[in-house]
Design a protein with these regions (language model features):
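Membrane-embedded alpha-helical segments and adjacent helix-loop junctions characteristic
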Residues: 34-120, 256-290
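Membrane-core helix-loop-helix motifs of multi-pass transport proteins
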Residues: 119-208
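Alpha-helical transmembrane segments in multi-pass membrane proteins
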Residues: 14, 18, 22, 26, ...
Length: 290
């Protein structure tokens, strides 16, 4: 299995095959029966991740709402404007904002959609392609230390851990360290590069139709604040934050329009994490039988 994984094999299929082989070996050795395998492995495994899967879906939906309402693109544009004509400061601010966005946002679609905006700006600031991609992904990863959606996934593997102040002290400290590494990487590289200022034109690609009002820019922080300060559960926090973004950006002008955008963003959110959900349902089969 290790060789299969190193060669780039599909881990979801690999875990399913391994779980099936181990079940067969257990039955041959008389350790378990087919009835036990059905209930505890093939049925009980995926069911044990049901609550986590739902949180993943709502987190991905929230990410789609941030994109469709223009909150993410506007936040990035304002960050570039704040940096002014200082490329290093602009780059650092972009990485910081990316980390903050992904403290609550989840889903591959959100990573791609926001990356499409940020990466061209980083490249125009003189950041080499490998460093631009690495810096962006590390900034995304820094936010994941306190992202409750990812925490719930890990909680399924390591039971007993709580999303409380003890964990958050570590989470925010780890986030700060990772962002600091990104800042150092970029700072050292930009000092060796002749920077051009074509980033202004790149930043201008965010059209006025996509701009969200300033009070909508707090949306990425709402789920985090509700979870940490007010001890809310993640799903209600995502729902409140999503409707706040839809309302203040004027996306809810009628009931039909509300139905349309919620259905569309929810659909896109589920599609974004479909392969992840498949993996999350197969993995516990392997865990149970092992």
């Amino acid at each position: 299995f290790t060789v299969y994984a190193i060669k780039g094999g599909n881990l979801m299929i690999g875990f399913l095959i391994m779980a099936s082989i181990w079940v067969a070996l257990g039955m041959i050795g008389g350790v378990s029966t087919w009835e036990d395998a059905q209930v505890k492995v093939f049925q009980g495994g995926p069911e044990s991740w049901g609550s986590t899967a739902v949180i993943v879906i709502f987190g991905s939906w929230f990410g789609q709402v941030l994109i469709k309402t223009g909150v993410a693109s506007t936040l990035i544009r304002k960050t570039v404007e704040l940096g002014g004509d200082k490329p290093l400061i602009t780059t650092i601010l972009l990485c910081l904002v990316t980390g903050l966005i992904f403290t609550s946002t989840f889903g591959a679609g959100a990573v791609v959609a926001i990356g499409v905006i940020i990466l061209p700006i980083l490249l125009s600031l003189g950041v080499p392609k490998p460093l631009a991609v690495s810096s962006y992904l590390m900034s995304v990863g820094s936010g994941m230390y306190v992202n409750i959606v990812l925490f719930k996934q890990m909680q399924g593997l390591f039971e007993g851990f709580k999303y409380d102040n003890n964990y958050l002290k570590f989470g925010f400290a780890a986030m700060a360290v990772q962002l600091l590494v990104v800042f150092i990487m970029i700072g050292v590289r930009l000092k060796k590069t002749n920077v051009n200022h074509s980033w202004a034109a790149t930043a201008g690609k965010v059209s006025s139709d996509e701009q969200a009002p300033w009070y909508a820019l707090i949306t990425p922080l709402i789920p985090v604040v509700l979870a940490i300060v007010f001890k809310w559960q993640p799903i209600p926090a995502f729902i409140v934050a999503s409707f706040y973004a839809l309302f203040v950006t004027g996306k809810i002008k009628s009931f039909k329009e509300c139905e349309k955008i919620i259905t569309k963003t929810f659909y896109d959110g589920v599609v974004d994490v479909a392969s992840l959900l498949g993996f999350l349902f197969i993995l516990p089969m392997f865990n149970k039988v092992s």
